[in-house]
């Protein structure tokens, strides 16, 4: 029996998208071996739900943020797995380290249960609370989307490095299909005219590490040469008003545009019509938005921190700059704005890199190999 535990599946966000990809491969792997598969979600609605992910249907049950109900469902599923017999494969995949204690409790009921816990980035760059850290250490495998995060899993969480594996997240296949025609797709009505720099994220006060404020403060260095330059920020959050005030104080409010509530096709069109993408963050464990921009053939500017330098090849597919350094960010932006040939070449290299290393098929093959390894051990 294969079991998947996830914080949330039917919602936007990088953690949610990675969870859907994990659940899709887990479901497909179980089906290929004639095994029962049960998927549980903490935050989704308390109902049986079906989602089509990468052409595969995943069926899961939510707990509507009721932690007690989620734990009870997980333990009930563990008892069901225990009843399958000694020889039947039993494996649970947790899509976030916060769920590691639940996995540990399930293993007390089903000692033969193999366990995988997935990490994402900033949440494991500092020591976790003791209970979570101890539970993470007991997992058979701990997955990280970048070498940087994998190193923190060992150094800060005390997980044996032999149990830590790097599994980069993948470009969503639905977005991959949209990226093919992104440059010709219809734009949202509020997308501005002129040369556009695009950024995408959640603009929350507790996530100012994304670097949106630095993008705003870099604009005055660029506008004298490119007076029609526009910064489009896709996404929303409780920090949007603060960022809008910052743009006004900086004197660039006419050049900063927030777009939210876009469809996937409209998002792809935004990528397709920008000059380049920029998110100078210091807290990306991987950075799925970088993959989306690269898939649309666009150069990328990211932060020289976290997992971003493992996605962006500095000087080849874009640039990485220190977080908070508006001068270095402006220099990288100037270099790209100055040279259309360079933008095209970097975009071509980035698109090829996604094709070779970050397609869903590459992710699925690697994850299936890990599942097979544990099921057969």
Name every feature range the model reports, one short phrase each.
Residues 136, 261-262, 269-274:
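Short alpha-helical donor nucleotide-sugar binding micro-motif in glycosyltransferases
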Residues 148, 170:
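Carbohydrate-associated surface elements
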Residues 190-210, 216-219:
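Conserved donor-binding/catalytic core segment of Leloir-type glycosyltransferases
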Residues 241-262:
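Nucleotide-activated donor-binding/catalytic signature segment of Leloir-type glycosyltransferases, i.e.
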Residues 282:
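Aromatic "clamp/platform" in nucleotide-sugar-dependent glycosyltransferases that forms part
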Residues 299-302, 312:
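Short hydrophobic beta-strand element within catalytic cores of glycosyltransferases
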Residues 314-315, 319-326, 335-341:
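Conserved acidic donor-binding segment of nucleotide-sugar-dependent glycosyltransferases
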Residues 328, 335, 342-356, 363-366:
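A short, well-ordered alpha-helix in the C-terminal region of glycosyltransferases
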